[in-house]
Amino acid sequence: MISENSTERISDADYPVWSKDEVIDFFENRLGLSKEIKIKGKIVTHHNEALYYWRKLIQEYSLSIPFEVVHIDSHADLGLGYPSWVFILDSLLSVPAEERIKIENYGEMFEKYYEPSIGDYLLFALAFRWISKLVYVCNPTDIGNDYVWMILKDGIEPNDKIQLAYNEKMKAIEIASNTEQYYATAYREPEVDFEILRRVEDVSYNGDFDYIIFCVSPNYTPAAADFISCSKT
């Protein structure tokens, strides 16, 4: 896993990017985007900035919750490889939903805590009850299973539902060895529809998006991809 503090770009040779024409084709013919129809949004450097942007929009009453998210990425950003998923299931879910979004207060609320980072911010958004449906458009060279299976409904994989669960009598790390018992006695969060699109051909939208967030993600992209966020055409 690449450090979030890393400033070194990954190799252009090892990670070839689409051409300008391929990018435009995906935007226009797969997402339904157009220069003629402007959609509000923001270009961010790191993925977790999206979470704070959403929070700002929600606080300004510009975005209603829960909302649907189409996440186009080579990574699910659902906490795989991060210890935060344990914090979320054991601690964050134990407090009212309206308190969970107060990230700046975690130091006062919890003895040990993690703040949203680039690889788990969507899991935090789920814990905030912001998302009603999550579509993960993964890298077509992968199978898109880079998530913590404990976040799925009943811990069953594969699954078209995400349902976080908090058990005050058991720890999240016990799920693997006591799966049925954990979920049988747990408090369940609202279900979230979960879909994984593994082929470019399966991506089909008509441009009906309220907001678009484009992330440069310098930690995980080669410099050759920077033209996408800088292009005016």
Functional labels for PLM-detected ranges:
Residues 1-233:
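Conserved alpha-helical scaffold segments that buttress catalytic/binding sites
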